[in-house]
């Protein structure tokens, strides 16, 4: 007796996983709206720094002033004590190694402008910007169907 199990081809399996990932992503985005709410930095008026630091790169983004970086990073580090050092904050942003904490200090001091990707990551983490959803322009197979290309 032979038992046969019909499985979808690898491209169809990948599409199933893609759909599952999209559904999980939608749930995660909705769940982000339930994050705890925190007030603004006491005695700090972020409005005087304009809004260009909140824009996307293709909309005319400009690096934020170091005073704003210090204030917002400082508040974040006070609220989330697991990131209370520059090294820990650097690791959160994917800056690993001995220079990560030094780079955070350089952003805070104005010695070095903060890169867009790190700043955008921070804005999303703090609910100051929404995550960008990249549109899928096409779903391309990774393997030939039925042995044909």
Segments from the language model and where they lie:
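Short acidic/histidine-centered micro-motifs embedded in hydrophobic/aromatic stretches
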Residues: 92-95, 121, 125
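Short, charged recognition helix plus adjacent turn
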Residues: 2-45, 57-59, 130-149
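Recognition helix of helix-turn-helix/homeodomain-like DNA-binding domains
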Residues: 90-113
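Short, basic-rich loop-to-helix N-cap that marks the start of a DNA-contacting helix
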Residues: 109-123
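Surface-exposed polar/charged interaction patches
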Residues: 24, 32-39, 75-82, 110, ...
